[in-house]
Amino acid sequence: MAASAFAGAVRAASGILRPLNILASSTYRNCVKNASLISALSTGRFSHIQTPVVSSTPRLPTSERNLTCGHTSVILNRVAPVLPSVLKLPVRSLTYFSARKGKRKTVKAVIYRFLRLHCGLWVRRKAGYKKKLWKKTPARKKRLREFVFCNKTQSKLLDKMTTSFWKRRNWYVDDPYQKYHDRTNLKV
C-alpha cells in the first residue's frame, strides 16, 4: 500500500523523478514476488526444507505482514525532502527590473494595453478585437470591443509589472472612468 502511494507521488512529480519511478516499481514487484514466495514456503508442507530464498534485493524482511521492501522505504526517505521543492510552482515576485541598480521597471506593453483603476482593478479589451475582422459578424465585433475586468491573478501580475507611478490616483479632465475608480456598496 505504501509502495503504491509512493509510486503515485513519484508519477505526480515531473520527469525529473522518472528514473526513481522505474526503480521503485521494479523493487516493489520484486518485494511482492519474494513475499508471496516466502508465504508459500512458510506453510506446514515445506517446514522440513531449509533452503535459503534467492532474492535480487538484499535483506528481504521475513515477516508476512511487512510487504514493503527495504529499498522502497530508503528511496522514499531520500526523495521526501526533495518533493516539496520539485512540486512547488515557481514564483516571480518581480517581473522586470533594471540591470544597473535592480530597481523596478514598468513593462510598457501593460501601460498601452490595460487601464488600472484606483481601486486596484485592471480594465482591458477582449482578446482578438482587432484580428480577422473580415470574417466576424457585426454583433461579434461589438462584443469584442467591450471592456472587461481582469481577474485576481491577472491583476496581481499586472501590479508586479508596473511601478508605483502608475498606481497613483489621476484627476483627468472629463475622465470617462471617473465613476469607476472607487468601489461602492462593498460589504466588508
From Swiss-Prot:
Q: Which GO terms describe its molecular function?
A: structural constituent of ribosome
Q: Which UniProt keywords apply?
A: Mitochondrion, Ribonucleoprotein, Ribosomal protein, Transit peptide
InterPro entries (alphabetical): Ribosomal_bL35-like (IPR021137), Ribosomal_bL35_sf (IPR037229), Ribosomal_bL35m (IPR019338)
> Main location per UniProt?
mitochondrion
Q: Biological process GO terms, please?
A: translation
Provide one Gene Ontology cellular component: mitochondrial large ribosomal subunit
Its domain of life reads: Eukaryota
Q: According to its UniProt record, where is this protein located? A: Mitochondrion
Family statement: Belongs to the bacterial ribosomal protein bL35 family.
Q: What's the protein name?
A: Large ribosomal subunit protein bL35m
Q: Give the source species.
A: Pongo abelii
What is this protein's gene name?
Answer: MRPL35
